Amino acid sequence: MTDNQEIKPKKLTLGNSKLSLNKSFDSLTGAQSFVNAKSKTLVEVRKSSTGSATTLSLNKERNSLDQTVIDANKEEFNRRLSILKKAAEQSQLNDPLKISTLSKLASINQSANSKIEPLETDKEVEQKQQNTEENKVEVSAKIVQDDEDIPSQIPKKKEETFVKSPLVGKRTRYGIESEKELDKTAESKIIAPKIKLEEPKKFKKADLFNMLSDDESGSGRTRSLAAIKRAREKEKRKLVSQAPEKVYREVTIPEAIGVGDLANAMSERVADVIKELMKLGILANASQTIDADTAELVATNLGHTVKRVQESDVENVLISDDKVEDLRTRAPVVTVMGHVDHGKTSLLDSLKSTDIAAGELGGITQHIGAYRVTLADGRAITFIDTPGHEAFSEMRSRGAKVTDIVIIVVAADDGIKTQTVEAINHAKAAGVPIIVAINKIDKPDIDIERVKNELYVHEIIGEEAGGDIMIIPISALKKINLDKLEEAILLIAEMQDLKANPFGSAAGVVIESKIEQGRGTLTTILVQRGTLRNSDIIIAGTAYGKVKKMTNDKGLEIVEATPSVPVEIQGLNEVPFAGDKFNVVQNEKQAKDIAEYRMRLAKEKKISIAPRSSLEDLFLKASGNSKIKELPLIIKGDVQGSVEAISGSLLKLPSDEIKLRILHSGVGPITESDVSLAHASSAIIVGFNVRAGANALTAAEKEKVDIRYYSIIYHLIDDIKAIMSGMLDPIVREQYIGSAEMRQIFNITKVGKIAGSYVTKGIIKKGAGVRLLRDNVVIHEGKLKTLKRFKDEVKEVREGYECGIAFENYQDIREGDTVEVFELIQEQRQL
């Protein structure tokens, strides 16, 4: 063994603290190993066992190695610092924030250098750029080349502990084993310690924010993320709170508008609109309605422009003109009018060869029917059958408005009647041609000339007499002269040149409407222009909806209807009135707007025509001494026209003491809500061709509500008239029954004066009313207190007998006075 064994060079790396040798080696010192925490490189140092001389040489070499590492770290730091300063100078004008950041990083690096912690420089290199690793490799390689077999110990950070490999050696009786053997043994037994590496700390936003937000005073206060979020939200609130630029709009103002609606139209606050109204001297809330002039002033004061529109403009979409080239010839619409039982429906029955009249109760048509008859030559005629009863004058007038020709049916054996005259007046008012059909000429003992003379009285002059009205004798039952009637209709239609536009949106008139269980609202309409198709959206009065199904007068389902074709449709949301015009619109919103406008008009009209009560009537009603009685009614019918006819007839019943009040009228069966309303108002429910449901009947029995059913209209009117007559106060009439002459006066104790009398005429009844006449002057009127025959009390004494008479609370009687006896009789009044 030699004292100076050659030590193989080992790879060195940068440590995190100053290299030092804290422990001296003795002769038994063996090999040591250590691990750098960053490079994880195992360094093995062989120790010489030659004594103190070897130890001194090792210490010198180790000190020189330490100085070399420190110098390399300083050079690396200075190089990086110069790069950072140059970058800061170049971007000084562009990014001052980045310069401050680099300055702070430079100060951090300088403080780390003052503590001589080379490992700190390695951390910065790892965080910044990759070329730092290359510099580290170059420095490590240089150290490995200059120094060989230098044992050293590199201390870690103060939180890390030194790890040493145990001394490896074997004593023998002759001393320690040879150094070479010792080195081999040490190499085989050196174990690399497991060191837990510390992960680099993550760089958070708060750290960067703290570095950037530190003021010059160097307070170094750390801001939390919550504080940063609060600051950001505060900035956002400041931005939101900034008033946006006001937008001025063009405001459309109708005839009346609510304050809230006006504010929405201008995109203004309701409070601002109310302030403007207060400036004008108007106190209003958000739900109050103001007129168009006031709304225009408010909008102008707020800087908006105003566009005035009429509320009726919503109906402008319904108005359209037809082009001449689009017009096509259409079938005539004929209305049949006349008195009850003069043969109107029988005439249509003969024309259609169907038994329509068999379905009419009492032989009276209860509602309008629309039928289309196709003749042998292919031409068609549309007939509208109107009821003849006087209650249906409103329906008849509507029928005259939609017709082209009017046929007035007059019975040859009955002549002109009240409803006949009314039908003539309706036809004249409508300005349509008239054809008179004198029916029932097959009956014996008829006088057609007498009927013609009666027509002359009403200015209905036939062609044979120089007039322009065609008078045709017919027999609907025997089908006599029906062909002449059809020829007359077609001739007049040809002279009128009836045309319509079958293209475009449909329009027409509602003939009748009703509610049918399981099918909903059914409406009979007559198309006057355009073509009506399934799924069209129509508006009729205040009712609107989509056409779900169409059927013709024969009950067959069809997909479209052209002008002069009557159809029954279903799909409306409510029952329209007979005579209402219908139009097809583009969408449901348009229909809804028009319906709402019409409902407002109807409501305003109803309020304006409401009966006004005098102050005296109000006081009498409040005290319960009102002389006017009320009969509340609820009317339900099968079709709208019948309900209107019933209401109109009942309201025409004359009475100054009874006021007929119709609480509700509608189409459909009697419901439980109708019963509840009747119970609350003590009303009578009238059902015309409808019945009450099971629940309604149960409720009516429980609440004792009177429900009456009718199928013929004049029976209903007579019954209501009788009820109103029963409510009238009866007439009290005085009926004379007899007289007596006083012949002698008797004074009886405890009784008073009794007149001995002789019955001269009629009978004297006890309890009847009496008048005492003296010299033909009435001096007292009262009642008989006592009536005696001799000593017996009797109820009456007839003519020619004597009796004793005493008066109630009256004693001034004399001989020769005359007594008249009478009774008060109550008679029921009639309307």
Curated annotation (Swiss-Prot):
It is found in: Cytoplasm. GTP binds at residues 338-345, 385-389, 439-442. Residues 385-388 are annotated as: G3. Residues 475-477 are annotated as: G5. Residues 338-345 are annotated as: G1. Residues 116-157 are annotated as: Disordered. Residues 439-442 are annotated as: G4. One of its GO terms (molecular function) is GTP binding. PROSITE patterns: G_TR_2 (PS51722), IF2 (PS01176). Residues 117-139 have a biased composition (Basic and acidic residues). Residues 329-499 form the tr-type G domain. Coiled coil: none annotated. CDD domains: IF2_eIF5B (cd01887), IF2_mtIF2_II (cd03702), mtIF2_IVc (cd03692). Gene3D superfamilies: P-loop containing nucleotide triphosphate hydrolases, Translation factors, Translation initiation factor IF- 2, domain 3. SUPFAM superfamilies: Initiation factor IF2/eIF5b, domain 3, P-loop containing nucleoside triphosphate hydrolases, Translation proteins. Belongs to the TRAFAC class translation factor GTPase superfamily. Classic translation factor GTPase family. IF-2 subfamily. This is Translation initiation factor IF-2. The gene is infB.
